[in-house]
UniProtKB/Swiss-Prot annotation:
GO BP of this protein: protein localization
Entry keyword set: Membrane, Transmembrane, Transmembrane helix
Source taxon at top rank: Eukaryota
Natural source organism: Dictyostelium discoideum
Pfam families the UniProt entry points to: ODR4-like
Subcellular location(s) of the protein: Membrane
Taxonomic lineage of the native organism: Eukaryota, Amoebozoa, Evosea, Eumycetozoa, Dictyostelia
Name of the protein described by the UniProt record: Protein odr-4 homolog
Record-annotated membrane-spanning stretches: 436-456
């Protein structure tokens, strides 16, 4: 097990805030190596929020502290796994759990290890990993102990070596893929089965979209067996293009309802620098499917709560034919480890950025989170396009008015010049006529003078 140096620091800080008898449990976040089956990278951790006591008076509801391992609410932990799993990009997964305990002997108490094994087995069904890691931190000694388990071991915990690396996140590359998809589905009588819908989507992606696609990294077609850091040296961010035959839409049948997926879906995955390129493709494909699934999960919950569906019909969502276009939640990119690795959240059509801040603070206990980017909605894009079109029209109209004005000015100038030319020509003609008249008079005067001199 290779862990980030920040994990030990975080465990020490959180241990100092706990009372001596209390226990803290949380999730380990990282990546399993595809090359080495025995190697797992643990990048960070998320403490599980304390459950709240249910009382009639909301003001008296208080967090329930964990006094023993057996008092841990397993269902609460599993629900937390579901929530966190949605917020992780491709390649980043829940790789295990950690506990801050009073003393290392706590694990040896009766039934405690058995409880942890059962908890890890339940988590394994959610994240579907090859193995799971378990880290315990003793408040008494300040030491970290590492164990691992998997299904072949029947989830029995076995000790494992822990290697600490400073800034482990710097050994990871980010993969980015922009995928434009509008999902079109037909419903019978305005009802859609939620589970069938998800199955259809996964089948469409895996059997149609991905099978007939070609993946390029940095506009290059590369062998899947190459080590990614050797092929792309000195790069920490790589762009992936997914070339498919049909990119505009995914359709199961003739259209009745449109699920607007914001035109461009920004998919992200992270991969350790020593992994193979085929693993990078696997992680980015996983993020594409996971992103669409998560959006439908959230949309289903929103529609169900609005429609007040009966308990007997929880799997179906009722759609209104008056609103054939449903906007899927938008993805929000949130900074997590420095500026290297991010997590995500989703904003519903009625959600605000304040909702996102609250979820991050309450669920992940990240104070003052930094949001890197938010997917723009299609409506906003349309509005922007309309504004651009209006601006273009205004510019065209202004251009036409300007041209018309210029033409009028040119015409006026031409008329003026024509008048000036005409006036000048008239003046010149008048002057010429006057000259001719003077010459004729002068000749007549000379002829009269000559006559009187010689004949009279």
């Amino acid at each position: 097990m290779i862990i980030n140096s920040n994990i030990k620091i975080t465990l020490e800080e959180r241990s100092n805030k706990l009372e001596q008898s209390h226990i803290e449990i949380g999730l380990l976040i990282g990546q399993e190596s595809e090359i080495s089956e025995q190697q797992t990278f643990v990048l960070g951790l998320f403490p599980t929020p304390l459950n709240i006591s249910n009382t009639d008076d909301d003001n008296n509801n208080k967090p329930i502290n964990i006094d023993s391992i057996s008092s841990i609410d397993k269902e609460w932990i599993l629900e937390y796994c579901h929530q966190v799993n949605i917020m992780l990009y491709g390649g980043i997964d829940i790789v295990g759990i950690y506990m801050i305990i009073p003393d290392s002997d706590t694990l040896n108490e009766k039934n405690n290890e058995s409880f942890i094994m059962k908890l890890l087995k339940s988590i394994h069904t959610i994240i579907n990993s090859k193995s799971l890691q378990f880290i315990s931190y003793s408040k008494k000694t300040g030491l970290i102990n590492g164990k691992a388990t998997n299904s072949t071991q029947l989830y029995r915990l076995k000790s494992t070596e822990i290697k600490v690396i400073n800034n482990l996140e710097n050994e990871f590359l980010s993969l980015h893929c922009i995928l434009p998809i509008d999902i079109k589905l037909k419903s019978k009588n305005g009802m859609i089965s939620f589970e069938n819908l998800k199955k259809d989507i996964i089948e469409i992606f895996e059997n149609q979209l991905f099978k007939e696609s070609t993946l390029l990294i940095e506009n290059e077609f590369v062998s899947g067996n190459e080590i990614i850091s050797q092929q792309f040296k000195s790069k920490s961010k790589l762009n992936i293009d997914l070339l498919i035959n049909q990119l505009d839409s995914i359709s199961t049948s003739s259209l009745e309802f449109n699920f607007n997926n914001n035109n461009n879906t920004h998919c992200i995955a992270y991969i350790h620098q020593l992994e193979q390129i085929k693993t990078a493709f696997k992680f980015i494909k996983k993020d594409i499917i996971k992103s669409v699934e998560s959006r439908f999960d959230l949309l289903f919950n929103e529609i169900s709560s609005n429609n007040n569906n009966n308990d007997n019909d929880q799997d179906n969502i009722k759609l209104s034919k008056e609103s054939p276009i449903l906007e899927l939640p938008r993805r929000v990119n949130i900074q997590w480890l420095s500026n290297k690795i991010s997590i995500c959240d989703y904003l519903s059509s009625n959600g605000t950025i304040d909702d996102c801040y609250k979820i991050i603070n309450d669920l992940l206990q990240i104070t003052s989170p930094k949001i890197n980017s938010i997917e723009s909605s299609k409506n906003n894009n349309n509005n922007n396009n309309n504004n651009n079109n209006n601006n273009n029209n205004n510019n065209n109209n202004n251009s036409k008015l300007s041209n018309k004005k210029e033409n009028n000015e040119i015409k006026e100038n031409k008329d003026t010049q024509s008048n000036l030319t005409k006036s000048t020509s008239q003046q010149q003609t008048k002057q010429t006529n006057n000259s001719y008249l003077i010459i004729i008079i002068s000749v007549l005067v000379l002829m009269v003078a000559f006559y009187f001199k010689f004949f009279v």
